[in-house]
């Protein structure tokens, strides 16, 4: 069936116009100009932490503007390609136009989803923690599978990731792991993954080959910015140091470089052992602790509102996705009902369709 290119391109232009309106390009350009002025100040690097915040935000705003404005050019180029192909009755060029149309539609959909990320912290980088829950060794193995899935997703997108801490289980898998995804809007995107994930499969660890159901929890936090003013007094934190350990509990470091921070008022505990020095591990652990305290404050505020409304739907312990490998293969989001049969691709990080569905579902719930 022949593609109705004029209708398709008209739909693209309508969506693109809506994206430009929602994105408020004038405000982005003004912010970019202000950031450029601040970045050019000779005194910028007198405060390295503030300088890094400015340069990171500058890069993010510039990338956002480029992404939106270049999309308009791609739609224009597509229209020209279609006109030339139809005038010359060139089948190869029309096939090329069809390929380009599909690519533009996919990227425009991703851009449209980005406009839905308007929450207070959505533009931040993300700190992800995965914990094995019920299910014994299978749960630990599942937690490691999820960790790899998210790291592969970040790799596929060209995002930098940094593993802060990994607590290995004795037989296989991990008890828990914490890592950062350093990319604009990583928090807004990955926060829809928060909750309990369920795996159903024939256990590779069961001698009788029985089916096993196991669970793992995913927590996603925004990286704290200096503007959040999350101050942690030294007298409220106990610092313990120990040797880093690997799979099976084996020591992987001959010095006490791993760090455990305990926030005494709340009891929150954070560990970091993957950096090279104790100082680096302490700094990374403090970033995670600040993120957890920021999230605790947000949840406390939300709990007050939920108590007034009688709403307890915000619990991150709710099951949100099932991964079934036996007796059939299916990954299904229990909130959106979106499902995919190619389970291997999902575990290899191809989760954009789930993320998009989750973001749209969340936005609908807010409206």
UniProtKB/Swiss-Prot annotation:
Function of the molecule: Peptide chain release factor 2 directs the termination of translation in response to the peptide chain termination codons UGA and UAA.
Protein name: Peptide chain release factor 2
SUPFAM superfamilies from the UniProt entry: Release factor
Molecular functions (GO terms): translation release factor activity, codon specific
Residues modified to N5-methylglutamine: 250
Lineage of origin: Bacteria, Bacillati, Actinomycetota, Actinomycetes, Kineosporiales
SMART domains, alphabetized: PCRF
Organism in which the protein naturally occurs: Kineococcus radiotolerans (strain ATCC BAA-149 / DSM 14245 / SRS30216)
Family according to the record: Belongs to the prokaryotic/mitochondrial release factor family.
InterPro entries: PCRF, Pep_chain_release_fac_I, Pep_chain_release_fac_I_sf, PrfB
Top-level taxon of origin: Bacteria
Modification comment: Methylated by PrmC. Methylation increases the termination efficiency of RF2.
Gene Ontology cellular-component annotations: cytoplasm
Main subcellular location: cytoplasm
Location within or outside the cell: Cytoplasm
Pfam families linked: PCRF, RF-1
Keywords associated with the record: Cytoplasm, Methylation, Protein biosynthesis
